[in-house]
């Protein structure tokens, strides 16, 4: 309905241009918004006020001209002018009911799908050889929910798990493995089962022994040069580390697979060419022996230029170098229209610099969009980054196990007589959903406080509340299996029926925002409001005990569409649903 309203206004504006009221070359972005107060209609626009200067008339006069030139539409009941010149559109109830019937019988809930694009989504991207920790959660689940939404909207999505599988840490691990195998033979590989301890021990040796550190750096060079022994060990480290990552992805319900992994090492052979191409264009400068690029737009607080370091004085490459190589690959090999980077907001300056440099150096197509989808930090209840009681980093697996345990206690308290196997399965779904939803429901650009108590509550905008809301709606159909809905249609008569129908019709607008701005919290907020609208409807409008058969069937259809929308929305967030809680 929103896009239809915009189309009506566009036709009216063209008519005013043809009549000479508005200059023919005047360009206006027609903004249409949902009203907050239904007494002001369903949609409102400030287009008349935007045209004031161009038309040389007052806004209310222009508003009337726009209304007079609107095409006839069966979707619009009436149009009114409000305040200084707002135009309010009231949508016809029958048109809304018809839209809901289309949604009910559609795989995509009746959405108008946009022109398909190829979208690269860079997310999760942990450093290998270490266990994933809570700091990896946000990129992983926010990125995955946006991926699901993009695919639902018909886009071709190329997942890219840009893992940190290259660099000094692997030299440390290789050197430490050499020491272990010299002492213990091939059995030393068993110590890799605890990657975190293995890495920690290698780091201690690296920090304490100059000889070990020198050998580690030498092994990095050998690895980068293609040494067969180093590459064999490197692949072992990566394989074990990736297996750990994918066990967590499966547990989290994240759609990343091994085929989506394209780490830093994939671009190793391209890095020298990146440097050479920047040099050939005269973009490189030297600073303390390093090769850097200065861009006029980026300066520090003192007004001094901030460099993008491309190659260190010792010949080593940095994140900027591999990011530029990856951008070139994503533009010119994958032919993407957009590339979305779900990376911590603290990397904002880095991405601003490399995105600008890639365009300046013509490494990427001019029309391709590169977007940093930054996010804030996940903090403990003290407002500081989430840590263990001893101050250490919280392993992601430990967080998920704790969520399982707490969810099991919660579900058992609600259902003391339930079978243990069913309790465990419900607790698994509730635990994972609660962790994910607690994050996804927050604006990704904001820091947020992680609280098990809040996220496992059945009150407020939480996963348990929404999962229960879905089971409540689904439960209606278990009691209405004998009702034949084949000839039923939706009728909106009661105010709460109209409110629920209006909320259901907003799903497409929310999805457009989610895929355009990478904001899962918009979908979370919508689902919470939808569950609330259904609750109000259910209290005011008896479904199975409706006064007429026609009304009962209509309300069952509204309930069916609500259940379908809730389930689809939760699925797009990467959450499983339950038929019973």
From Swiss-Prot:
Pfam families on file = Arg_tRNA_synt_N (PF03485), DALR_1 (PF05746), tRNA-synt_1d (PF00750)
Q: Which terms does the record give in the GO molecular function aspect?
A: arginine-tRNA ligase activity; ATP binding
Tell me which family the UniProt entry assigns to this protein. Answer: Belongs to the class-I aminoacyl-tRNA synthetase family.
Keyword Metal-binding on entry: no
Give the species this sequence originates from. Shewanella halifaxensis (strain HAW-EB4)
Q: How does it assemble?
A: Monomer.
The main place the protein resides is cytoplasm
Q: In the UniProt record, does the keyword Nucleotide-binding occur?
A: yes
Pinpoint motif 'HIGH' region by residue range.
126-136
Per its UniProt record, what NCBIfam families does this chain match? argS
| E.C. no | 6.1.1.19
Q: Which SMART domains match?
A: Arg_tRNA_synt_N (SM01016), DALR_1 (SM00836)
Q: Catalytic activity annotated for this protein?
A: tRNA(Arg) + L-arginine + ATP = L-arginyl-tRNA(Arg) + AMP + diphosphate
Name a GO CC annotation attached to this entry: cytoplasm
Q: Coiled-coil region(s) at which residues?
A: none
Q: What is this protein called?
A: Arginine--tRNA ligase
The compartments listed are: Cytoplasm
> What domain of life?
Bacteria
What keywords appear on the UniProt entry? Aminoacyl-tRNA synthetase, ATP-binding, Cytoplasm, Ligase, Nucleotide-binding, Protein biosynthesis
Q: Which GO terms describe its biological process?
A: arginyl-tRNA aminoacylation
């Amino acid at each position: 309905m929103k896009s239809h309203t915009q189309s009506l206004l566009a036709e009216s504006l063209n008519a005013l241009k043809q009549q000479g009221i508005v200059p023919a070359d005047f360009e206006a972005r027609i903004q249409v918004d949902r009203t907050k107060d239904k007494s002001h209609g369903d949609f409102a626009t400030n287009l008349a006020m935007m045209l004031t200067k161009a038309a040389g008339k007052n806004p209310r006069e222009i508003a009337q001209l726009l209304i007079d030139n609107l095409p006839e539409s069966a979707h619009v009941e009436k149009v009114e002018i409000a305040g200084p010149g707002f135009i309010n559109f009231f949508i016809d109830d029958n048109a809304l009911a018809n839209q809901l019937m289309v949604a009910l019988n559609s795989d995509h809930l009746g959405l108008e799908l946009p022109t398909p694009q190829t979208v690269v989504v860079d997310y999760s991207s942990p450093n290998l050889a270490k266990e994933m920790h809570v700091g990896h959660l946000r990129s992983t689940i926010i990125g995955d929910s946006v991926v699901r939404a993009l695919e639902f909207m018909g886009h071709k999505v190329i997942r890219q798990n840009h893992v940190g599988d290259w660099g000094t840490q692997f030299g440390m691990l290789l050197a430490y493995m050499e020491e272990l195998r010299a002492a213990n033979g091939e059995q030393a590989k068993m110590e890799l089962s605890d990657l975190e301890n293995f890495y920690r021990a290698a780091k201690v040796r690296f920090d304490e022994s100059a000889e070990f550190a020198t050998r580690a750096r030498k092994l990095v060079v050998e690895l980068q040069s293609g040494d067969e022994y180093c590459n064999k060990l490197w692949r072992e480290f990566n394989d074990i580390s990736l297996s750990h990552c994918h066990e967590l992805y499966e547990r989290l319900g994240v759609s990343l697979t091994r085929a989506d992994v394209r780490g830093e090492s994939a671009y190793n052979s391209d890095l020298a060419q990146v440097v050479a191409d920047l040099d050939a264009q005269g973009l490189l400068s030297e600073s303390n022996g390093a090769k850097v690029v200065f861009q006029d737009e980026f300066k520090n607080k003192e007004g001094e230029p901030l460099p993008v370091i491309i190659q260190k004085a010792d010949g080593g490459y940095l994140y900027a170098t591999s990011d530029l190589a990856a951008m070139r690959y994503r533009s010119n090999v994958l032919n993407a229209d957009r590339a979305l980077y779900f990376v911590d907001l603290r990397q904002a300056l880095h991405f601003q610099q490399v995105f600008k440099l890639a365009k300046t150096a013509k490494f990427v197509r001019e029309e391709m969009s590169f977007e940093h989808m930054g996010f804030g930090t996940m903090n403990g209840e003290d407002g500081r980054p989430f840590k263990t009681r001893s101050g250490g980093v919280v392993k992601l697996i430990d967080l998920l196990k704790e969520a399982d345990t707490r969810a099991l206690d919660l579900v058992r308290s609600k259902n003391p007589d339930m079978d243990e196997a069913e309790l465990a399965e419900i607790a698994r779904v509730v635990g994972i959903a609660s962790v994910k939803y607690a994050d996804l429901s927050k604006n990704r650009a904001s820091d947020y406080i992680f609280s098990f108590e809040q996220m496992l509550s059945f009150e407020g905008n939480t996963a348990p509340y929404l999962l229960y809301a879905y089971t409540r709606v689904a439960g209606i159909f278990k009691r209405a299996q004998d009702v034949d809905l084949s000839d039923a249609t939706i009728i909106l008569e009661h105010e709460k029926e109209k409110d629920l129908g209006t909320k259901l019709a907003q799903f497409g607008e929310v999805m457009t925002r989610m895929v355009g701005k990478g904001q899962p919290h918009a979908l979370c907020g919508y689902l919470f409001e939808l569950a609330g609208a259904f609750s109000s409807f259910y209290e005011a409008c008896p479904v199975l005990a409706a006064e007429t058969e026609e009304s009962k069937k209509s309300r069952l259809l509204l309930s069916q569409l609500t259940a379908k929308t809730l389930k689809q929305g939760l699925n797009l967030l990467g959450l499983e649903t339950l038929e019973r809680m």
